[in-house]
């Protein structure tokens, strides 16, 4: 988790602790800390470590309730971090 924190900080974001319930970090837009609420909620994980679909849906719904964008930060086996924006998909 620290490496993800450090990567976000190096990109110029303001990073604060998560709210609990599975979210690791709150991330504020560059230069906007204190002016607006966090735009992103970061859920961090390692490549190959499974997460249940139920847990992912629960965190996604909570982020939607808070009007935040959920981002999955995955650290791969080489130590690189890849970010995925998560949103709900409805099939009809």
Task: Report the location of each language-model feature.
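Active-site beta-strand-loop-beta-strand hairpin of nuclease catalytic cores
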Residues: 28-41
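Short, well-ordered coil/turn elements that cap or connect secondary structure elements
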Residues: 10, 37, 65-67
């Amino acid at each position: 988790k620290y490496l993800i924190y450090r990567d976000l900080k190096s990109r110029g974001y303001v990073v604060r602790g998560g709210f609990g319930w599975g979210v690791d970090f709150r991330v504020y837009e560059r230069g906007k800390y204190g002016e607006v609420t966090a735009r992103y909620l970061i859920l961090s994980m390692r490549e190959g470590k499974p997460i249940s679909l139920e847990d992912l849906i629960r965190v996604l719904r909570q982020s939607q309730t808070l009007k935040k964008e959920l981002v999955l930060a995955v650290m791969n086996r080489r130590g690189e971090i890849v970010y995925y924006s998560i949103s709900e998909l409805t099939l009809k």
